[in-house]
């Protein structure tokens, strides 16, 4: 390590101490919160086991790993730990690869490291030259970085280092976060401030927050970021913006994070260079090849494009009589000489189809096997749109000859924005562990994504995170936990929601068991609570249109039927639910036969999906013994009670949480309880008005009538223009 690098690391170390000394807890550090180990016995043990940091190599990534270890160990062990490459001392932490570290090379780890690939790593307590050491070894510098973060996580979560011996490698290749950031810094479906990217000061000024953003993602093994909205502005490909984006790419590169861009399919026309964007027109093909060359001249390791095409008004190849494969392959050809890929979103639904549920499958399945090998279909977990609970997208089980990756949503578009606590880990786990039967037993979504089922070339997972300039990045402190769970599951889809929650709580708040266990259980139930007070039993899309915040199950008068709530629930005097069996839209036929058979049968379909696939009588007998009307009411009331239980749990944690974050979560849970009651009352009263059935007397009765809640929907979030006749009643 050069003298300059050592000086740089020292400056990083001392600079990192200043914010901790000057600021109270505000959530900025996320899970990289390196506070001293509170258990004094354990602290002394760690202090004995790691006394020195030995670093070989001088790449930006090795320097980033060394800086993180200095920062983390000095904080956790409550004593300065400085990186050196001098003579090995007893009880050192040694990091490196066999190529850049003679000490690592001396351990002859060749076969063990070879099995871990380019990004995997090995952590082990061993001896070198009779000296006690802990090693972080990998085949590449980025593997060393990932291993360094893992070692810090072990100490943060108070795992023993005695006899440490573990290895880890990612199961998925592309582990990517998506931002829906516009160039004016407004974040679509973002609830935590403005966009992180300050275009006005780039490329000259790189805010320290950009490096912290890279650290946060690298700590999870995330290796790519798409920094702009899928509803893309063509100007993102201009020289003016490419200069700025290149500066961001430079900041992210030491942390193993590739830069990707969302592109507008009509960009050749928008730039005025050609009068068409037809993907089979040679002029258009050449335009994209030339533009790709320009991008790579700015960003040599550019990852590729994310494309939303022929969806919700965005242009695409269908506007020129071409299909998705022809559009994607044209872009893929432009990127292929540079090693770039195309993430092509499968989120499509046209207004002229009988059932929106069927849209993506019917459009993409005929194209299976026609996409280029550097095209990856980016498919949402369900067939509609990030609803609180959806069945899995049938595309995952069907597209056996096409690269596919998952798209999850971390930003809470349908879970109460930044005001509701709704840990998404259980949703991710539920999806990834779903058995599709695509190739018999073991064909889980996770295994399909990994390439184990269909042997695809590219694998991956994307998460729409949408952080912003709020000090804590995500608005609600617990939205951080969903970001964390996404990253951990993108690295290893077999990690459970409970494990991710446990780690996050320990790293973010406290290791005290009296805190961990109740709050972890609160987190694990929070997603189900959100389902229950919004859309239980397989109901879906009951939101106020546009903002997607509050309830509006009565919506029936929008330009497109599939934007209304009544389209989905189909409630009437006699029953409720969407018939997707053979006697209905037959969307169930898109699934493998074992799934179609089980979900088409009222005796075997899971009750939490039943109204997705069946239109049932209000008198249908449920597993609880209640009829469907009674069960629906019960679920709505159960959701509110679950939120109230979450409040009681959090109220008991004041001794374990700093005052600022405790007060913020407490206040937000009060908002959530109020909104859960509004959801419950709005939906129960509306469905009562349709079914003509009473709310059982043993339940808390709504304070207001249905018309009140209809009016309230217009003023709670993004109010409609002022109309005294329709708004005055709400304001009384």
Curated annotation (Swiss-Prot):
Site (Participates in a stacking interactions with the sugar rings of 4-O-MeGlcA): residue numbering on this chain: 180, 563
A single cellular component GO annotation: extracellular region
Regulation: Inhibited by 4-O-MeGlcA.
Top-rank lineage group of the source organism: Bacteria
GO process annotations (BP): glucuronoxylan catabolic process
Compartment(s): Cell outer membrane
Effect of residue 413 to C: Retains 20% of the of glucuronosidase activity
Gene3D superfamilies registered for this protein in UniProt: Alpha-glucuronidase, C-terminal domain, Chitobiase/beta-hexosaminidase domain 2-like, Glycosidases
Reactions mediated catalytically: Hydrolysis of (1->2)-alpha-D-(4-O-methyl)glucuronosyl links in the main chain of hardwood xylans
InterPro entries recorded: A-glucoronidase_C_sf (IPR037054), Glyco_hydro_67_aGlcAse (IPR011395), Glyco_hydro_67_aGlcAse_N (IPR005154), Glyco_hydro_67_C (IPR011099), Glyco_hydro_67_cat (IPR011100), Glycoside_hydrolase_SF (IPR017853), Hex-like_dom2 (IPR029018)
Signal peptide: 1-20
Residues annotated as the enzyme's active site: 312 (proton donor), 385 (proton acceptor), 413 (proton acceptor)
A single MF term (Gene Ontology): alpha-glucuronidase activity
Binding site for beta-D-glucuronate: 231
Residues that, per the record, bind substrate: 188-189, 308, 345, 356, 380, 407, 541, 563
Main localisation: membrane
Family: Belongs to the glycosyl hydrolase 67 family.
Self-association state and partner proteins as the record states: Homodimer.
PANTHER family noted in UniProt: ALPHA-GLUCURONIDASE A
Role this protein plays: Alpha-glucuronidase involved in the hydrolysis of xylan, a major structural heterogeneous polysaccharide found in plant biomass representing the second most abundant polysaccharide in the biosphere, after cellulose. It catalyzes the cleavage of the alpha-1,2-glycosidic bond at the non-reducing end of 4-O-methyl-D-glucuronic acid (4-O-MeGlcA) side chain of short xylooligosaccharides and releases 4-O-methylglucuronic acid. It can also hydrolyze small soluble oligosaccharides such as dobiouronic acid, aldotriouronic acid, aldotetraouronic acid, and aldopentaouronic acid.
Record-given protein name: Extracellular xylan exo-alpha-(1->2)-glucuronosidase
Species of the source: Cellvibrio japonicus (strain Ueda107)
């Amino acid at each position: 390590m050069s003298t300059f690098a050592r000086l740089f690391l020292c400056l990083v170390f001392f600079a990192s101490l200043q914010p901790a000394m000057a600021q109270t807890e505000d959530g900025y550090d996320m899970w990289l919160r390196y506070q001293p180990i509170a258990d004094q016995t354990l602290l002394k043990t760690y202090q004995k086991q790691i006394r020195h940091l030995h670093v070989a190599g001088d790449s930006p990534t090795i320097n980033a790993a060394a800086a993180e270890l200095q920062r983390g160990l000095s904080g956790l062990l409550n004593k300065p730990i400085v990186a050196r490459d001098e003579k090995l001392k007893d009880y050192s932490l040694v990091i490196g690869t066999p190529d850049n570290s003679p000490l690592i090379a001396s351990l002859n780890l060749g076969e063990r490291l070879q099995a871990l690939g380019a990004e995997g790593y090995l952590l082990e307590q061993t001896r070198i030259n009779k000296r006690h050491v802990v090693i972080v070894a990998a085949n590449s510098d980025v593997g060393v970085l990932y291993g360094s973060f893992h070692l810090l996580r072990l100490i943060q979560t108070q795992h023993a280092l005695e006899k440490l011996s573990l290895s880890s490698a990612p199961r998925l290749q592309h582990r990517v976060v998506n931002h829906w950031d516009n160039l004016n810094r407004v974040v679509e479906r973002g609830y935590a401030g403005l966009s992180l990217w300050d275009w006005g000061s780039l490329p000259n000024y790189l805010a320290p927050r950009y490096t912290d953003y890279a650290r946060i993602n690298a700590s999870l093994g995330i290796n790519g970021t798409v920094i702009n909205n899928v509803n893309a502005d063509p100007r993102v490909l201009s020289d003016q913006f490419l200069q700025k984006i290149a500066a961001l790419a430079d900041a992210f590169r030491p942390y193993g994070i590739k830069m990707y861009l969302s592109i507008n399919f009509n960009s050749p026309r928008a730039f005025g260079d050609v009068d068409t964007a037809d993907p089979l027109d040679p002029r258009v093909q050449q335009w994209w090849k030339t533009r790709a060359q320009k991008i790579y001249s700015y960003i040599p390791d550019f990852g590729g494009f994310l494309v939303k095409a022929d969806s919700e008004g965005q242009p695409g190849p269908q506007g020129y009589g071409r299909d998705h494969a022809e559009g994607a392959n044209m872009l893929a050809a432009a990127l292929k000489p540079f090693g770039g890929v195309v993430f092509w979103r499968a989120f499509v639904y046209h207004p002229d189809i009988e059932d929106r549920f069927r849209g993506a499958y019917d459009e993409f399945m005929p194209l299976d096997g026609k996409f280029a090998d550097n095209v990856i279909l980016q498919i949402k977990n369900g067939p509609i749109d990030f609803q609180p609970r959806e069945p899995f997208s049938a595309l995952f089980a069907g597209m056996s000859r096409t690269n596919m990756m998952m798209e999850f949503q971390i930003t809470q578009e349908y879970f109460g924005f930044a005001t509701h606590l709704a840990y998404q880990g259980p949703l991710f786990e539920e999806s990834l562990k779903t058995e599709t039967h695509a190739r018999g037993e073991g064909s889980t979504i996770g295994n399909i994504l990994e390439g184990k089922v269909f042997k695809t070339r590219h694998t991956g997972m994307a998460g729409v995170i949408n952080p912003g300039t709020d000090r804590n990045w995500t608005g609600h402190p617990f939205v951080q936990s969903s970001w964390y769970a996404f990253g951990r599951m993108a690295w290893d889809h077999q990690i459970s929601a409970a494990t991710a929650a446990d780690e996050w709580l320990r790293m973010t708040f406290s290791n005290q068991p009296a805190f961990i266990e109740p709050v972890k259980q609160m987190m694990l139930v929070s997603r189900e609570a959100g389902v229950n007070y919004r859309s239980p039993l397989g109901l879906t899309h009951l939101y106020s249109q546009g903002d997607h915040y509050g309830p509006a199950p009565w919506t029936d008068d929008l330009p497109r039927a599939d934007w209304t709530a009544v389209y989905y629930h189909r409630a009437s005097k006699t029953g409720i639910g969407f018939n997707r069996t053979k006697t209905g839209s037959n969307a169930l036929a898109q699934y493998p036969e074992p799934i179609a058979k089980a979900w088409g049968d009222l005796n075997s379909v899971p009750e939490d999906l039943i109204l997705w696939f069946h239109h049932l009588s209000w008198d249908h007998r449920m597993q609880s013994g209640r009829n469907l009307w009674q069960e629906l009411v019960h679920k709505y009331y159960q959701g509110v009670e679950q939120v109230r239980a979450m409040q009681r749990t959090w109220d008991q944690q004041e001794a374990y949480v700093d005052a600022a974050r405790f007060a913020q979560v407490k206040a937000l849970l009060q908002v959530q309880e109020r909104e859960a009651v509004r959801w419950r009352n709005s939906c129960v009263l509306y469905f009562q008005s349709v079914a003509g059935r009473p709310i059982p007397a043993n339940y808390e009765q709504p304070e207001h009538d249905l018309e009140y809640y209809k009016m309230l929907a217009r003023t709670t979030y993004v109010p409609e223009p002022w109309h005294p006749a329709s708004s005055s009643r709400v304001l009384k």
